[in-house]
């Protein structure tokens, strides 16, 4: 297994790059987010997910950060989602957007690229359970904001607390963390 690769980007294609590591060119499939940050000749470090397909061919998938890799791992555990489908989802949605779509039960966020209504519903349902079991820092909810952690430490459900915070932030974008927590407590105690 390969944990990460650091090398020089030799070539860039629609959904993969060729990364030169010690004069060996690796074909690494990446999301559009990764492709946008790639320039030929630049040095890059990618976290690698290795997959051996039905034809016994090894495919490498690369990620700029561990969170995107974790979401890829979660997505491929869902029946009907293979690595290529998962990378296409990650090309369309960031981990934060996936989290938001799951907690708000927005099945339409996943539709397209071969994902119909049924599979989108399965993704939403199965990820709700998986995300609720993740440690807080891995859910990528609000990195610079302690409001969610405060509500969870008070015993509130992670998904309900997140939804309350998102609603408050949408209606009161300039509120301080203290104000957000106060309003969320009021909302959650109703």
Swiss-Prot record:
Transmembrane segments: none
Region (Flexible linker) location: 143
One GO cellular component term noted in the UniProt record for this chain: Holliday junction helicase complex
Sequence segments annotated as region (Domain III): 143-190
Ranges where the record places region Domain II: 65-142
Gene Ontology BP terms: DNA recombination; DNA repair
Region annotated Domain I, chain positions: 1-64
Domain note: Has three domains with a flexible linker between the domains II and III and assumes an 'L' shape. Domain III is highly mobile and contacts RuvB.
Assigned protein family: Belongs to the RuvA family.
The protein's name in its UniProt record: Holliday junction branch migration complex subunit RuvA
Lineage: Bacteria, Pseudomonadati, Pseudomonadota, Alphaproteobacteria, Rickettsiales
Gene encoding the protein: ruvA
């Amino acid at each position: 297994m390969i944990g990460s690769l650091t090398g020089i980007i030799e070539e860039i294609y629609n959904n993969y790059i060729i990364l030169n590591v010690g004069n060996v060119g690796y074909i690494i499939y990446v999301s559009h987010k990764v492709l946008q940050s790639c320039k030929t000749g630049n040095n890059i470090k990618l976290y690698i997910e290795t997959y051996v397909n039905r034809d016994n061919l090894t495919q490498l998938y690369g990620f700029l950060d561990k969170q995107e890799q974790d979401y890829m791992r979660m997505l491929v555990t869902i029946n009907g989602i293979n690595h290529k489908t998962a990378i296409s989802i990650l090309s369309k949605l960031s981990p934060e957007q996936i989290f938001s779509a799951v907690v708000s039960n927005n099945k339409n966020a996943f539709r397209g690229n071969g994902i119909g209504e049924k599979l989108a519903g399965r993704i939403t349902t199965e990820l709700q359970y998986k995300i609720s079991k993740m440690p807080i820092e891995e859910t990528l909810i609000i990195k610079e904001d302690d409001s969610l952690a405060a509500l969870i430490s008070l015993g509130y459900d992670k998904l309900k607390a997140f939804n309350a915070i998102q609603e408050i932030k949408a209606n009161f974008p300039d509120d301080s963390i203290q104000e957000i927590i106060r309003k969320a407590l009021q909302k959650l105690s109703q």
